Amino acid sequence: MTHKHLFSRALALDPERLHFAAHSHHLWPDASFDGQVRAWVEANHFADRKWDLVFADVVPEAQKHISKELGLPDPETVVFAPNTHDFLIRIFSGWETKPVRILTTDGEFHAFRRQAERWEESGEAVVTRVSLEPFETFDERFTAAAQGGGHDVIVVSQVFFKTGQAIGCIDDLAALAKPEGPWVIVDGYHGFMATPTDLSAVADRIFYVSGGYKYAMTGEGAGFLHAPHGFCERPVVTGWFAEFGNLMGPPEGVQYRADAGRFWGATFESTPLYRFNGVRRMLDEQGLTTADISAHADRLSARFAQALAAGECGDLGEAVVLNPIGGDNAPRARFLALKHPNAQAWRARLLDANVVTDVRDDVIRFGFGLYQTEEDVERLIAVCKRLF
């Protein structure tokens, strides 16, 4: 079965391209184009009244889509920003005792990695990093470090961006979280709409950040945060949008909304939310769930992994697969991460052949998604065999 018709505009721009970077810059479905146009039309139709519409209709719809996807009991625990870095800054600003004691890993995405390093340099944070390797013991080691205490904020990825390895200790970390600390922040960028994610049991204790750029098929500008009630109630870095609505706090001081709106910034571009809502409506109309899309991607990646193991992809078969496909139906990334000294060169040769992947250091990543078919994977295998 093919779903290419849902992506007709994007695919028509380069019909011969093989795009296996769905985990990086996912192609946008036609529904996102319709959302983009709707945003323009409504902005110009309603002009100054646009914001009434955005906050009455567009934002609540997006909140409901995310709450449904993640099993959140209250849509108003969701707030939006152009990117997840904005939320990291605001959450950490709310911990006013410095230096902030951070527990994290050596595998976090650059937005947090770089910021944490700079906080260390400035004396604003003391950072403890737990190694991902050996990953077989990661959950046990990271949980033990968290249970050891002495940390104000714990930051960890649901699925690690470079290796595609997924953690299994979110419940254990959530059990430690308290409004007075530690706060637990889960980076869900490679989990949201990539693998079925149910946060209903931990929604009252963890922060969860993600966005629309990857598996939500929405593009840039649609970062979001789930913020549990009672945690970080007065972030120091705060925008003027955070003072709209039902406010709380000392009458003589700066007041905040009680819901996730306490993390609003200032004037933002609402168009990405139009795209996101359009994509989610499309999925509902097509009867496609994250479980369905994940299963489709798993079938494609399993065939590619089989070809690698059988030597059908030339020298690519010499790479170490960091996130091999298991038979336990455990949450997993929507890409295969292959570690090899030639990863950069392989990616360049594939790009010259109009095959798009991406590379992180010595790891080349092949991402699978809704707009690919079994025939596309066979073409990919044939190209790899010819090139390598």
Give, region by region, the residue ranges found by the protein language model.
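Pyridoxal 5′-phosphate
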Residues: 1-388
